[in-house]
Amino acid sequence: MKMKKLLACLLAVSAMVSAVGCNFPFGKTSSSSDSITSEEQGGGSGLAGIPEATVPQEDFQAHYVEGMLHEVNVDYNSPANLNFIKDGQSEYKIVLGASVANESLAYVNKHFGLGAGSMLEKVEALTDDEQENLAVSENSAYVMFGCTYAFEEAGFVMPDYEKIGGTGYYVVTYGKNVFVQAYGAQGYQLGGIALLRYTLGFDMISTTTCVYEKDGSVLPKMEITERPDFDFRQLDNQLIGHDVSYGMGFTTSEMFLNTGTAWMHNVVDFLGGDASLGANDGTNVAHPKWFSNDTNQTQACFTAHGDKEEYALMVENYIQKTIEFMKKRPSTDNIVIGQMDVISNDRVSRCTCASCNAAFAYYGDTNAGAQLAFTNDVSRGVDAWLETAEAKEYFKDVAGIERKEMNILVLVYGSSINPPVTRAEGGALLFDENGKGIPKQQKWFNVDEGGNVAEEDVLDAEGNPVELVCAPSTQLFYCASSANYLHSFYEAENATYSNMVKGWSGLGGNFYVWTYEVNYFNYMYPYNSYDSMLENMRYFKNTGANHLFYQGLYENANNAGFDKLRSYICSKGLFDTSVSYEEVVAKFFKYQFDEAGDIMREYFNQVVQQLRANESYTGGSVHSNDLTKAVVWPEGLIRTWYNMVNEAFAMVEYKKTADPERYEQLWTALTAESLFPRWVLCTTYANSTSFSNESLKDMRRAFAEDFNKLGNTTHKEHFTISDVFTTWDM
């Protein structure tokens, strides 16, 4: 029996949204393609009327990753039990054998109750004796999390840590019982999700939709060994709540140590405060050479203006600050030393002192050489401290950590995006026989009192020249914000950036990746990164990355442009890069919009086709206003999409009384997708003769009301929409 349930309890925004229809202020307009002329279609697409719905990227174009661990053996024909949870009843008990599995067990048991109608009785058996007393046999009925003693007594052997790491898991049935085993909390999280998937057909689609495709009566025979393709799967939208992100399989623990200002653009936290506002401890007065040479000292100077004494003091300051941060968050193993972001020209991108300029030129028009050399010195100092008795005792006593490690990341971003590697005479990157960048000899650039620069070789303890490569605990965080994310890094449009990746790959270090999925100048508009996302995951996994962060929105809870689809693609692809794009998209529309799924999929396909046909107008930058050009979005087409969302609402209107809880969720999902065409009508076509001034006021009032109900605040990165609303005559 197939069963689908959709949970209001997972909808964080539900409390903010009243169960009322979308505020469409004017009547339905014609959706006939005959009513839209070729000229109205615009954008040089060559299409007359509404573009045909297209199937997105076909799977045969995919660059699949080999060697990933997804050994899934699930047998429903010879199940472990046909009466696992039936008619809200179960003989089973759920057993906690290790405290590290507690959150996963609680999450699974909650969904047994929500999806199958019965939570299982919980038993704690944290010791060998307690597990022995359970008398586990093939005829007992237990769901066991972390019960290592019982697991081994049943004759099972855990896969090696080298194989599944702390994020992988092993799920296996033993008679009527099932074991969920892992080496860490993330492994138990994903193992628990797997158990829900194969017993309940569980899938967390979005903040508004959780689905159960099975009724929980069958416990299939299982043996599953899996490890996610990316061990670190960072959430793309930070406003997705913990419960939903946990169920989507994102890493929910703190991956990067927050130093105060942030976890990424945080260099000022190592210097005593926000330098652009004046360091609150006067550090920038006592040590001006630690800062960039602009008037407001907005960045760090990674060469200390060529002054070796100041450089040594600066390195030691960063070491001590890093140790201080580590002690505050002892369980976090990654810290970024990241230059401040440049927002609206409020900061310089780098220091331009004589020493930094010399390093910039020597390493190939990049600040990365100086930044990597500095980070290496900090990293070695932190590693040396971690070997001391003081450090070992501290982390063992405070966090139970036997051997603490700390990865210190270089933020490969902005003026540091180019790799500091060997280049040909014309500036082109040179690669070795393995297609990797060739390291350069490390240099120091002294600056005397007269401002003269003298180049000096950096030598090791034996007096040998040193190549600039990553120190043992120095890692790379690659953030190509200027790439074209309409395309994958396999495509010609991103050849420059894929060459940079190859260049960086010659410098060692683990590769962390930060990519982008929306246009940050225009949150209201769809950005066609949907079908390139999986390919970019495959590209970076094939280059050796183990962490990927697809930065989406972090300022709006329910944005336009099918933003929830991107989060769903992330959740699936970061776990298994071989998933089918078409299957992921089809499942999303099937469940996210219920009966309106088909028309919303048609709307999506038409938007994608329109964007593809007009890429010459929009370009692919995530920091551009070209996406808003009127030629790309003719009024007739925008009205057609507006009407399609209106029709979608009509299809689910009956649920307002039949299932009010679900209607609230659908209201949120559909209203979010209505924002794009309504925004274009309220802005680009505000002077249209198609409606009166009073209609425009009504339309804008309704838009503002719904935008706020959805829990949104922002129309452009760092700019609240209230600035726009104050200019509207409402």
Can you annotate each of these PLM segments?
Residues S18-G21:
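C-terminal motif of bacterial Sec signal peptides marking the signal peptidase cleavage site
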Residues G544, C570-M730:
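Catalytic domains of carbohydrate-active enzymes that cleave complex glycans
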Residues L313, I319-L507, T515:
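Gly/Pro-rich turn-and-neighbor structural signature
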Residues N23-P25:
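Bacterial signal peptide processing site
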Residues K4-A12:
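Sec-dependent signal peptide recognition
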Residues E91, V95, S99-Y107, H111, ...:
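Feature activates predominantly on carbohydrate-active enzymes
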Residues C301, E309-E316, Q320, E324-K327, ...:
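Structured mid-domain segments that build the active-site/substrate or prosthetic-cofactor binding neighborhood
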Residues G27, I36-Y170, S217-E223:
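Acidic, contiguous N-terminal accessory segments
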